[in-house]
């Protein structure tokens, strides 16, 4: 009787194994063993080769662009303005083709963020309280993407149109419990912090924070000479004017370019012989960083670019300066985009928040509103509101009325002013803040542009991308997700840097007005326009 373990059917060929079959089995075993050995050798060869030749990897480039204070309305206004100015119906801004999503901007302390908390969300990939510069809610410093990149062997750069110690650049390169501790921020930027120097290239304004208190143009509260420290201790090449910038060739890092005492000029007030534009600084920075990457076989670079004064124009409710700043930011974006398309990497552009509550359209009377706005008014303008307010304050009071009528109002796009406009400006003539408000309102009403605030708003802002980032960031996102992407993409550790910074100083004295007799507009933008 068959056992339960016996096969149901007879096995084919059952019986003694032939010699030829045994030989084939032996060859198969040897072949499999050989393949396994070869595979192991090949794996370890390539693994060790990869490790020993890490410098031959294709470098990674991350360009983070921040259009400070620019909201969706800014783009609508600028697009229509360019269409009118150049008779280009259907015109598209350079940014338009690269829209990938939108960002929510709240901070940990408010539904409406300030620039410091907004920038720290990008740099540390964490929410924090308004006013915090590279510092978390517990008032402990957090490692930034720029610092982590530098620690990992990348080159780093910052290009802005504000003081380099202002909230956004500071939040990537320094740590302060309050954004107005600009003495401390400048010290971090020249390498006096616990990590040493983290920034290889720094372009913008804000010279006053690097000069000792005894110096005429200083705004420091002490006598530290940070230019001397930067040059002698850290080897910075220092550029202080347009000539220095133009003569820059075969530049060696580190580079420190401080092209004004405070912020750089608005684009509409730009004097080419005095200081470079944002787009020029961006082009030079990219060239210098790329050349340095090729020469020292670094991993690549991280570059922060900020269109800082878009925000400041909106704080003033100045549609003239605002539209020209947005145009210049688009030129800078075009340069950065071309770089990434040629060399690879990731370009991210977004805003930290919207400023001003800008609306393209305004009800200017109690009657039912017209469905229009008038970009042609802005196209006639010659200067920013700050520039003209300063000019009024400094003008001979005996000839002020004709000056307002014949120069100031035509310079804001109103060639045929009415008596009320002239009167309102004249009444406000002694107070720079009142003048800015009056002038901004006159041109905004004339152009039918609306504003809801002189501060920030909670509106979501656009996110744009070029290169590999477009495969990872999509749709509506929290601002910290942008920082998280950069950390993963560059393969760096923010937490490791945070650990190194656990005893880093975050308290310092606020800056002070310098002794130099600057224009009222300089004082305004240096110490009051972006306090929100």
From Swiss-Prot:
Broad class of enzyme this protein falls into: hydrolase
Keywords noted in UniProt: Hydrolase, Magnesium, Membrane, Metal-binding, Phosphoprotein, Signal-anchor, Transmembrane, Transmembrane helix, Zinc
Name under which the protein is recorded: Alkaline phosphatase
Record carries keyword Acyltransferase: no
Residues that, per the record, bind Mg(2+): 68, 166, 168, 306
Cofactor binding remark: Binds 1 Mg(2+) ion. Binds 2 Zn(2+) ions.
SMART domains the record matches: alkPPc (SM00098)
Biological source species: Schizosaccharomyces pombe (strain 972 / ATCC 24843) (Fission yeast)
Family affiliation: Belongs to the alkaline phosphatase family.
Family annotation (InterPro entries): Alkaline_phosphatase, Alkaline_phosphatase_AS, Alkaline_phosphatase_core_sf
Binding site for Zn(2+) 2: 68, 352-353
Region annotated Disordered, chain positions: 1-20
Catalytic activity: a phosphate monoester + H2O = an alcohol + phosphate
Main localization, broad class: membrane
Entry GO terms, CC: fungal-type vacuole; fungal-type vacuole membrane
Residue numbers annotated as active site: 115 (phosphoserine intermediate)
GO biological process terms held by the UniProt record: nicotinamide nucleotide metabolic process
Disulphide bond pairs: none
A GO molecular-function annotation: zinc ion sensor activity
Transmembrane segments: 27-47
Cofactor: Mg(2+); Zn(2+)
UniProt membrane topology term: Single-pass type II membrane protein
Compartment annotation: Membrane
Binding site for Zn(2+) 1: 311, 315, 456
EC id: 3.1.3.1
């Amino acid at each position: 009787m068959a056992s339960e373990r016996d096969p149901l059917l007879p096995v084919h060929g059952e019986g003694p194994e032939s010699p030829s079959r045994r030989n084939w089995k032996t060859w198969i075993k040897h072949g499999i063993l050989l393949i396994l050995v070869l595979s192991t050798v090949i794996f370890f060869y390539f693994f060790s080769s990869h490790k020993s030749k890490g410098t031959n990897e294709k470098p990674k480039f991350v360009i983070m662009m921040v259009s400070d204070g620019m909201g969706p309305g800014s783009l609508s206004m600028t697009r229509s303005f360019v269409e009118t100015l150049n008779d280009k119906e259907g015109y598209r801004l350079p940014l338009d083709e690269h829209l990938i999503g939108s960002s929510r901007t709240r901070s940990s302390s408010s539904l409406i963020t300030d620039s410091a908390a907004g920038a720290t969300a990008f740099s540390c990939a964490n929410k924090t309280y308004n006013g915090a510069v590279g510092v978390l809610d517990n008032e402990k410093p957090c490692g930034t993407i720029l610092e982590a990149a530098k620690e990992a062997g990348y080159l780093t750069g910052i290009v802005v149109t504000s003081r380099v110690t202002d909230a956004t650049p500071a939040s990537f390169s320094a740590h302060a419990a309050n954004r107005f501790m600009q003495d401390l921020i400048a010290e971090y930027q020249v390498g006096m912090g616990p990590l040493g120097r983290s920034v290889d290239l720094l372009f913008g304004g804000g010279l006053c924070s690097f000069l000792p208190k005894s110096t005429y143009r200083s705004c420091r509260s002490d006598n530290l000479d940070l230019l001397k420290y930067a040059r002698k201790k850290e080897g910075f090449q220092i550029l202080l004017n347009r000539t220095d910038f133009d003569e820059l060739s075969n530049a060696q890092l580190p580079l420190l370019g401080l092209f004004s005492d405070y912020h750089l000029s608005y684009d509409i007030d730009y004097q080419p012989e005095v200081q470079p534009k944002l787009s020029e600084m961006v082009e030079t920075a990219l060239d210098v960083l790329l050349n340095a990457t090729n020469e020292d076989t670094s991993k690549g670079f991280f570059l922060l670019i900020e269109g800082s004064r878009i925000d400041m124009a909106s704080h003033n409710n100045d549609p003239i300066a605002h539209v020209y700043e947005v145009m210049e930011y688009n030129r800078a974006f075009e340069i950065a985009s071309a770089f990434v398309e040629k060399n690879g990497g990731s370009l991210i552009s977004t805003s930290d928040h919207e400023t001003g509550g800008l609306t393209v359209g305004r009800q200017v009377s109690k009657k039912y509103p017209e469905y229009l706005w008038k970009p042609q008014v802005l196209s006639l303008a010659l200067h920013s509101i700050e520039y003209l307010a300063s000019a009024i304050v400094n003008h001979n009071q005996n000839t002020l009325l004709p000056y307002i009528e014949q120069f100031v109002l035509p310079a804001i796009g109103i060639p045929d002013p009415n008596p009320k406009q002239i009167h309102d400006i004249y009444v406000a003539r002694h107070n720079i803040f009142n003048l800015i408000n009056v002038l901004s309102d006159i041109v905004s009403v004339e152009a039918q542009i609306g504003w809801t605030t002189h501060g920030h708003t909670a509106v979501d802002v656009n996110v744009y991308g070029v290169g590999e980032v477009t495969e990872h960031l999509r749709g509506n996102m929290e601002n910290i997700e942008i920082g998280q992407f950069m950390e993963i993409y560059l393969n760096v550790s923010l937490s490791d840097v945070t650990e190194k910074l656990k005893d880093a100083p975050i308290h310092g004295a606020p800056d002070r007005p310098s002794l130099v007799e600057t224009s009222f507009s300089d004082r305004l933008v240096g110490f009051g326009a972006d306090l929100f």
